[in-house]
């Protein structure tokens, strides 16, 4: 939870400017629609490889270049197939950061909207239809990343051989590819058709799924991917990562100062927590979050875990703090690190700041992979403890409020 001062009123543009801009805009002719990317196939590639990628969309004629915002991915060839299709050969360095990399296509008419290209650490396998049931399942060798498509009522089935006690991890990227409203369902079944593990939604991956399981006996196991409501179409593209990689979804501490070295404990893997020394990036991304790849026993996770970057002074929750009289004292501005360790847990903080100043109080939980849905309430720091304001969800399950410090020079959160 981070407390940040609100900009001075002198730095805010008057609201009347907004009305003026809107009024002028109504009299201007509509600009022509720019280029748009609707599908990227494949939507990702492995480190250290060259990948031919097809971009399909609208008004992509006279394409000049594929522009990556930050990734060190080189475009070695560009081919205009037709006004709606562009092919590019991408060279991905062996040390390219894992995860999503934002790109646009620049044409003679301008830039497309942002899309994402995913970089994985495994070799890539293309789906081979038909693979709709266990009898026709496509055999794959782990570790690998499968590129597939779920069409209407389609179920894609992949077969792996596991020894007794062998571990398998699977993670699917679908909704996060931002190509289609594709809500995938992921499950692992044994050779008799019994479900060993399943995941529909995940606290770190939103509507995408991730799971890990240990084989109770030697045999063939099947990973199935489908649309959660058995829908699908040609745009429901996915990346399925298969291997024995770790699957944590939360870091502790979940935040740190840019450029500092921290000992991170990764949480959420069924095999238990594990530790890893991490040096946080010195440069803070626009979103204020660094994507860090957990590594256990030399094996990297397929999915990075976000860690909040902030220059604010760190303040650790001091339990017990489940009532106002025991509230943790915080001198604003600060970044508060806290945990909900039990059901019905309530944490109280006494925030001290000059009276009359205005502060943002923002919770970071689900954005960092935590499964909790935070509720934030702000109260006066007096005997009555009158509620000043509060929030449950703000642009997602995490909470955010703005509060002006009362005369007491403090308030309770």
Regions found by a protein language model. Give the residues of each.
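N-terminal secretory signal peptides that target proteins for export/translocation
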Residues: 1-14
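Extreme N-terminus of proteins, especially the signal/transit-peptide cleavage junction
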Residues: 12, 30-33
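Acidic, Ser/Thr/Pro-rich low-complexity intrinsically disordered segments
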Residues: 33-85, 94, 98, 108, ...
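Predominantly extracellular/luminal regions of secreted and cell-surface proteins
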Residues: 115-142, 298-334
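Hydrophobic or amphipathic alpha-helical targeting/insertion segments
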Residues: 100-104, 112-117
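Bacterial N-terminal signal peptides
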Residues: 17-29
């Amino acid at each position: 939870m981070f407390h940040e001062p609100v900009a001075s009123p002198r730095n805010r543009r008057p609201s009347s400017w907004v009305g003026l801009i809107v009024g002028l805009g109504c009299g201007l002719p509509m600009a022509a629609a720019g280029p748009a990317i609707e599908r990227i196939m494949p939507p990702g590639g492995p480190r250290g490889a060259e990948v031919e990628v097809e971009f399909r969309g609208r008004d992509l004629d006279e394409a000049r270049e594929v522009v990556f915002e930050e990734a060190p991915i080189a475009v070695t060839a560009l081919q205009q197939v037709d006004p709606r299709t562009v092919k590019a050969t991408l060279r991905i360095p062996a040390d390219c950061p894992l995860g999503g990399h934002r790109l646009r296509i620049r044409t003679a008419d301008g830039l497309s909207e942002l899309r994402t290209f995913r970089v994985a650490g495994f070799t890539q396998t293309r789906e081979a239809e038909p693979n709709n049931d266990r009898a026709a399942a496509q055999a794959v060798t782990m570790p690998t990343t499968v590129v597939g498509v779920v069409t209407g009522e389609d179920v894609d089935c992949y077969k792996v051989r596991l020894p007794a006690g062998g571990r398998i991890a699977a993670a699917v990227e679908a909704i996060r590819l931002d190509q289609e409203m594709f809500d995938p369902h992921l499950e692992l079944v044994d050779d008799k058709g019994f479900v060993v593990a399943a995941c529909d939604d995940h606290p770190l991956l939103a509507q995408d799924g991730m799971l890990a399981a240990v084989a109770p006996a030697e045999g063939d196991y099947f990973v199935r991917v489908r649309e959660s409501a058995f829908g699908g179409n040609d745009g429901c593209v996915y990346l399925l990562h298969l291997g024995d990689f770790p699957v944590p979804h939360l870091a502790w501490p979940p935040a740190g100062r840019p450029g500092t070295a921290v000992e991170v404990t990764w949480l959420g893997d069924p095999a238990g927590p594990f530790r890893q020394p991490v040096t946080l990036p010195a440069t803070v991304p626009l979103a204020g979050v660094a994507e860090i790849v957990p590594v256990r026993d030399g094996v990297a996770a397929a999915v990075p875990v976000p860690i909040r970057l902030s220059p604010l002074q760190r303040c650790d929750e001091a339990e017990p703090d489940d009532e106002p009289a025991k509230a943790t004292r915080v001198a604003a501005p600060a970044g508060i690190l806290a945990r909900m360790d039990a059901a019905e847990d309530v944490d109280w903080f006494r925030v001290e700041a000059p009276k009359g100043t205005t502060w943002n109080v923002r919770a970071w939980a689900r954005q960092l992979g935590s499964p909790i849905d935070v509720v934030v309430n702000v109260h006066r720091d007096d005997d009555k403890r009158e509620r000043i304001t509060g929030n449950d969800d703000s642009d997602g399950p995490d909470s955010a409020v703005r509060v002006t410090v009362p005369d007491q020079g403090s308030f309770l959160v």
